[in-house]
UniProtKB/Swiss-Prot annotation:
Major subcellular location class: cytoplasm
Gene designation: grpE
Function per UniProt: Participates actively in the response to hyperosmotic and heat shock by preventing the aggregation of stress-denatured proteins, in association with DnaK and GrpE. It is the nucleotide exchange factor for DnaK and may function as a thermosensor. Unfolded proteins bind initially to DnaJ; upon interaction with the DnaJ-bound protein, DnaK hydrolyzes its bound ATP, resulting in the formation of a stable complex. GrpE releases ADP from DnaK; ATP binding to DnaK triggers the release of the substrate protein, thus completing the reaction cycle.
Assembly information from the UniProt record: Homodimer.
Region of interest: Disordered: 1-41
Name of the protein in its database record: Protein GrpE
Entry similarity comment: Belongs to the GrpE family.
Keyword Zinc carried by entry: no
Length: 196
């Protein structure tokens, strides 16, 4: 046996020993490099964090913009709906004096006079047809008596003592009021009953 063969551990060839030692050295090197952080890895991690934050901000901005757009669309639709619903308001306001004049003409007309009967009937029919037309477009008359005073549709002109009507109720309508699609165009001018 040669001296080389004696120094090698149990039947290993010298090349195998060198390869084993070389593997041990390589195994040690990664441990050293794992302790040292590569500045490029740090920069990549930092950039990834910044990217994630920027994406989050962009997502929030997009959601906010979408919500604003939805709100604007909804408001615009409501405004258009209201404009269609109340487009006749100005026209109806112009018609109210005509309707009031026909009402007053009927109040003062001498209905007992047979000579005026055709004229009174003509005024009644004209008033009825005009009210029918405006009702088709959502106009309602406020002229009820013996109902509780509602400041949204009544304007109290005076308070009068009454035994027939409960206190706080409408006793008489001095001038009719009108609503258009539920919105008061003109409040009814009324006298209100008060307790004795």
């Amino acid at each position: 046996m040669s001296s080389k063969e004696q120094k090698t551990p149990e039947g290993q060839a010298p090349e195998e020993i060198i390869t084993e030692q070389h593997d041990d050295v390589e195994a040690v090197e990664p441990e050293v490099s794992a302790e040292q952080v590569d500045p490029r890895d740090e920069k990549i991690a930092n950039l990834e964090a910044q990217l994630a934050e920027a994406q989050k901000r962009e997502r929030e901005v997009m959601l906010r913009a979408k919500a604003d757009e939805d709100n604007l669309r909804r408001r615009t639709e409501q405004d258009i709906e209201k404009a269609h619903k109340f487009a006749l308001e100005k026209f109806v306001n112009e018609l109210l004096p005509v309707i009031d004049s026909l009402d007053r003409a009927l109040e003062v007309a001498d209905k007992a006079n047979p000579d005026l009967a055709p004229m009174v009937e003509g005024i009644e029919l004209t008033l009825k047809s005009m009210l029918d037309v405006v009702r088709k477009f959502g106009v309602e008359v406020i002229a009820d008596t013996n109902v509780p005073l509602d400041p949204n549709v009544h304007q109290a002109i005076a308070m009068v003592e009454s035994e027939d009507v409960a206190a706080g109720n409408v006793l008489a309508v001095m001038q009719k009021g009108y609503t258009l699609n539920g919105r008061t165009i003109r409040a009814a001018m009324v006298t209100v009953a008060k307790a004795k």
